[in-house]
């Protein structure tokens, strides 16, 4: 603080704009004071304008949406909370909205980051000639994301295809992963569904997938997690279809589906996983039965195994129970 002609004024570093008291501002200053702002006074008189106000504070648990460049593609992600970093990786044809019911719970203990993988959600959808759309490419994008937001070591939670991406990252970048949560990951060949059968058709498969894959078939893929009287997942499915129903998105989804059909690299990577791991499964998962989860936990060297009374998406079907189990594992138990 400096004294000039018996009038006190802020030094430049003490005020947001570095301007001393100006007589013509007195009326405005009085209006601010009358409005209830706590302005500096000397001898009952105002002595500084503009007033210095404390910056507004924000609840860190309130999700914020940001963009970052990763492997040459723009990635949209949602961030909420403080604490140890936790990265949530969504399933095929999904996005960060799949975690909407658990982010408020998890952000009470963790700094949660939920990205849209390239080609999905609100992230950029580069052509397959520029982006590979396989588990390894997605995991490399997550490495870039972590570096861009200043994360040196994280816990990873991946659902279905996202679990496969998380598994790949833990196998190739073990130094980056603190703990691993695999939710119904695609590791062993699943029971074929309509979508994978279409994608595997020669010649006509790409045309059907990119041109004729409509809302009804899209919704049928998510039907198990829509049931149960919860309308929120149903609204999310419609939102996801709107994001999918564009040429670039369909091209990316088709390339990803083709890569997902071969799970042999994932199975081969299991012995390289040394990260403490929780394997979570939905008891009513028809595409990947619970026996797949038990086998994976066993082959990971005795990872913790948790079964939920739901279908393929515990985070959407039983979010409170899922968040509690994940929080307990990440803050306490070590898994394998």
Which residue stretches match the model-derived regions?
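Conserved alpha/beta-hydrolase catalytic His-Asp/Glu region
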Residues: 192-193, 211-272
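Short beta-strand/loop motif that positions the catalytic acidic residue
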Residues: 273, 279-281
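Catalytic histidine-centered segment of alpha/beta-hydrolase-like enzymes
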Residues: 311-323
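Active-site loop/oxyanion-hole signature of alpha/beta-hydrolase fold enzymes
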Residues: 68-72, 78-80, 114-157, 324
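Flexible "cap/lid" loop of the alpha/beta hydrolase fold
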Residues: 171, 178-210
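Conserved HGGG/HGGXW glycine-rich cap/lid loop of the alpha/beta-hydrolase fold
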Residues: 73-125
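Alpha/beta-hydrolase fold catalytic core
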Residues: 1, 6-10, 17-86, 107-110, ...
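Acidic catalytic loop of the alpha/beta-hydrolase fold
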Residues: 283-288
């Amino acid at each position: 603080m400096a004294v000039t002609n018996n009038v006190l004024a802020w030094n430049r570093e003490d005020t947001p704009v570095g301007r001393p008291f100006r007589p013509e501002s007195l009326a405005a200053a009085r209006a601010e004071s009358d409005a209830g702002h706590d302005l500096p006074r000397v001898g009952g008189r105002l002595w500084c304008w503009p007033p210095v106000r404390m910056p507004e504070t924000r609840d860190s648990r309130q999700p914020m949406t940001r963009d970052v460049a990763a492997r040459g593609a723009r990635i949209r992600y949602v961030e909420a909370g403080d604490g140890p970093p936790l990265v949530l990786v969504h399933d095929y044809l999904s996005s960060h909205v799949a975690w909407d019911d658990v982010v408020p719970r998890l952000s009470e203990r963790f700094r949660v980051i939920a990205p849209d993988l390239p080609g999905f959600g609100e992230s950029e959808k580069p052509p397959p000639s520029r982006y590979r759309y396989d588990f390894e490419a997605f995991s490399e994008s997550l490495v870039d994301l972590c570096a861009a937001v200043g994360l040196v070591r994280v816990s990873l939670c991946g659902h279905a295809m996202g679990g496969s991406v998380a598994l790949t990252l833990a196998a190739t970048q073990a130094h980056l992963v603190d703990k691993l949560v695999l939710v119904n990951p695609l590791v062993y060949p699943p029971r074929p569904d309509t979508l994978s059968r279409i994608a595997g058709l020669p010649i006509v498969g790409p045309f059907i997938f990119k041109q004729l894959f409509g809302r009804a078939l899209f919704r049928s893929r998510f039907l198990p997690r829509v049931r149960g009287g919860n309308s929120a997942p149903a609204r999310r499915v419609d939102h996801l279809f709107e994001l999918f129903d564009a040429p670039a998105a369909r091209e990316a989804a088709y390339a990803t589906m083709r890569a997902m059909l071969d799970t042999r690299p994932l199975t081969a990577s299991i012995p390289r996983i040394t990260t403490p791991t929780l394997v979570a499964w939905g008891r009513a998962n028809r595409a990947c039965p619970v026996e797949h989860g038990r086998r994976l936990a066993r082959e990971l060297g005795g990872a913790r195994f948790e079964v939920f009374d739901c279908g393929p998406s515990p985070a959407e079907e039983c979010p409170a129970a899922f968040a509690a189990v994940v929080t307990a594992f990440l803050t306490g138990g070590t898994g394998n």
